[in-house]
Amino acid sequence: METFLFTSESVNEGHPDKLCDQVSDAILDACLEQDPESKVACETCTKTNMVMVFGEITTKATVNYEKIVRDTCRGIGFTSPDVGLDADNCKVLVNIEQQSPDIAQGVHGHLTKKPEEIGAGDQGHMFGYATDETPELMPLTHVLATKLGAKLTEVRKNKTCPWLRPDGKTQVTVEYRNEGGAMVPIRVHTVLISTQHDETVTNEQIAQDLKEHVIKPVIPAQYLDDQTIFHLNPSGRFVIGGPHGDAGLTGRKIIIDTYGGWGAHGGGAFSGKDPTKVDRSGAYIVRQAAKSVVASGLARRCLVQVSYAIGVAEPLSVFVDTFKTGKIPDKDILALIKENFDFRPGMIAINLDLKRGGNFRYQKTAALGHLGRDDPDFTWETVKILKPKA
């Protein structure tokens, strides 16, 4: 039996790039909560003792940017210089301007266009992917890496492992076989966890706790065997972390945000962007399309691409590939997708309820992946059952 290895990684909410994603999306939430027509393009960067937010925001909302930055950092666990950032005493820099009137006129006609007329906020191409290898219809490598990261955060915050600090990374290698184009996981080959910790804990304790409280509860026993390799804090020590250890920037973790290296990626980041930005809304609708194809039993694996021109509502192209796993020809699946999904940005925003912010709606997406999540706020995960014409 011919097999191959594939690897996906994830990072925790305390990773500096992910901190920035969460700040950008917390600001988006605050704007949309008060003004659903807010136009937001918010970037964040961070380094030792400093967080800066910058970009273009046009909104009727009254937003205290500094408070949002501090609250977000505090919520993650950055409460002292020792852990990498002190939310209450760090410098917060804000440089926000209005959306360019040229873009505003071309995309939404200064808010005068009807939803079906609203153009894409920029050019670009986005991909959606789904695979039947997990209940989430997501790649197992990505699901496990992400769940390990979520468990690390959980056992840090509930004090099961009080030595943990917010920053951390995970990586999982799975051995697969290709079954006529479908991906079948056989076993977990390697588990890698690098987590920030305090000065008191020994490397032995770290390895023991990670195996007991993080790996065992997350990775199903059927995938682990005596050949599975564990690299637990392989660099030795990881005391200095967060923005003190590395600079952070919004939009640096786009593969972690999506499919862990499976499928494809058009290059556009998600966080800090309102739904007129097709980098985000386009990627969400094609995930819904690909997931619906697999959930409807039309294919075991599916990739969907959509592309846009700035200011133009209708997509330039829609593409489907089922990797030879389709029950009907790909051209028929493409026709079904076009009949059942409206790819115009204004209609995506309505159909997926993307103008609704607040209550951490977008901030939740900014750590632990935007896709494959079981949460009613992740409207793009709702399956539409697609039925081929008789």
Swiss-Prot record:
Q: What is its EC number?
A: 2.5.1.6
Induction (UniProt) = Transiently induced by elicitors from Phytophthora megasperma, salt stress, and sucrose.
* Binding locations of L-methionine: 56, 99, 246, 277
Instruction: List the molecular function annotations (GO) for this entry.
Output: ATP binding; metal ion binding; methionine adenosyltransferase activity
Q: Name one Pfam family in it.
A: S-AdoMet_synt_M
Q: In which tissues is it expressed?
A: Mostly expressed in roots, and, to a lower extent, in hypocotyls and cotyledons.
Q: Name one GO cellular component term.
A: cytoplasm
Translocase keyword on record: no
- Note on how the cofactor is bound: Binds 2 divalent ions per subunit. The metal ions interact primarily with the substrate. Can utilize magnesium, manganese or cobalt (in vitro). Binds 1 potassium ion per subunit. The potassium ion interacts primarily with the substrate. Potassium can be replaced by NH(4) (in vitro).
Give the reaction(s) catalysed: L-methionine + ATP + H2O = S-adenosyl-L-methionine + phosphate + diphosphate
Cross-referenced InterPro entries: ADOMET_SYNTHASE_CS, S-AdoMet_synt_C, S-AdoMet_synt_central, S-AdoMet_synt_N, S-AdoMet_synthetase, S-AdoMet_synthetase_sfam
Whom does it interact with, and what assembly results?
A: Homotetramer.
Q: What is this protein called?
A: S-adenosylmethionine synthase 3
